[in-house]
From Swiss-Prot:
SUPFAM superfamilies: P-loop containing nucleoside triphosphate hydrolases. This is Putative peptide import ATP-binding protein BAB2_0818. GO terms for biological process: peptide transport; protein transport; transmembrane transport. Keywords: ATP-binding, Cell inner membrane, Cell membrane, Membrane, Nucleotide-binding, Peptide transport, Protein transport, Translocase, Transport. ATP binds at G43, E44, S45, G46, S47, G48, K49, T50. Residues 7-250 form the ABC transporter domain. One of its GO terms (cellular component) is plasma membrane. The complex is composed of two ATP-binding proteins (BAB2_0817 and BAB2_0818), two transmembrane proteins (BAB2_0815) and a solute-binding protein (BAB2_0812). Belongs to the ABC transporter superfamily. It is a peripheral membrane protein.
Length: 317
């Protein structure tokens, strides 16, 4: 990318201290997202995907690292400055049932951020809420109803509308369809894709569904135990994965075409505890291609082809 990225993350870390150990949930994570780009973040449960999303918006405080958003270091902003910044950075939560207050009307939920930011008159805020509902294809009378009156898919549309009311530049979509029925997931994914293209949104799309990520994302970041394993364009990553972990993930995607199916690569064991990560490469204990040097060398992200990076000391595997 030649232009200055909208979001630039360098050396992001999030550690939790217990009585007996330090939990390294994220460790030295760095990536960029260009304006108007959709970047997917994939990995197994417990890899740190949600922690990255929440750290970027400072919904949780990072332990270390720099988070540059349009030239401002988010990690160093005061509470007042961060409140102003949040009108440009919004979050779509995974659970559409838990993320909406049962005591508030949908209109009150949609206008809450506008009230906090002091944007517009009451009539102008109401108009923004109505516009957001229209953008997510919900009827106008939605505004006077309560969350329990809607299905899971409708609630997630309301969550998307809430993020849109502040007209943000950047959205973190944290597994926005994983809690929905399969029949509804495609509708919500298509809606997000349409909104992103129509409004020119920049998005970090967190998911464990690799088929959805391929459909909606321009580039993909593969995360394992709090470290980045691979970064590439969606097209290149799915066609020519360079890291053994990425290959294992992609081999698990079901295909209806018998001729297109690949041999399933089963990873041995479970993901290690962040309290006691393996030395060297954190993936080595489950990697089918590991060698002795993997136990002593921490692999750094390196460019193996134009725009394609992997964290692996081995070549041509």
């Amino acid at each position: 990318m030649t232009e200055t990225p909208l979001l630039s993350v360098r050396g992001l870390a999030k550690h939790y201290q217990t009585r007996s150990a330090t939990l390294k949930i994220l460790d030295n994570v760095s990536f960029d997202i260009a304006r108007g780009e959709v970047v997917g973040l994939v990995g197994e449960s417990g890899s740190g995907k949600t922690t990255i999303g929440r750290s970027v918006l400072r919904l949780i405080e990072p332990t270390a690292g720099q988070i540059m958003f349009d030239g401002a270091d988010v990690a160093t902003l005061s509470a007042r400055e961060m409140r102003r910044q949040r009108r440009r950075m919004q979050y779509i939560f995974q659970d559409p049932f838990a993320s909406l207050s049962p005591r508030m009307t949908i209109g009150e939920i949609l206008m809450e951020g506008l009230n906090i930011q002091g944007i517009g008159t009451k009539a102008e805020r109401l108009e923004r809420a109505r516009k957001a509902l229209e953008q997510v294809e919900l009827p106008p009378d939605t505004i006077n109803r309560y969350a329990h009156e809607f299905s899971g898919g409708q609630r997630q549309r309301i969550g998307i509308a809430r993020a849109l009311t502040l007209e943000p530049d950047f959205i973190v979509a944290d597994e926005p369809v994983s809690a929905l029925d399969v029949s509804i997931q495609a509708q919500v994914v298509n809606l997000l894709r349409d909104l992103q293209q129509r409004l020119g949104l920049t998005m970090l799309f967190i998911s464990h569904d690799l088929a959805v990520v391929e459909y909606i994302c321009d580039r993909v970041i593969v995360l394992y135990l709090g470290r980045i394993m691979e970064i590439a364009s969606s097209e290149d990553l799915y066609a020519r994965p360079q890291h053994p972990y990425t290959r294992a993930l992609l081999s698990a995607i079901p295909s209806p075409d018998p001729d297109a199916r690949t041999e399933r690569q089963i990873l041995r064991g479970d993901i290690p505890s962040p309290a006691n990560p393996p030395s060297g490469c954190v993936f080595r204990t489950r990697c089918p291609m590991a060698i002795d040097a993997c136990a002593t060398t921490v692999p750094q992200l390196r460019e193996v082809r134009p725009g394609h990076f992997k964290a692996c000391i081995r070549d041509n595997i």
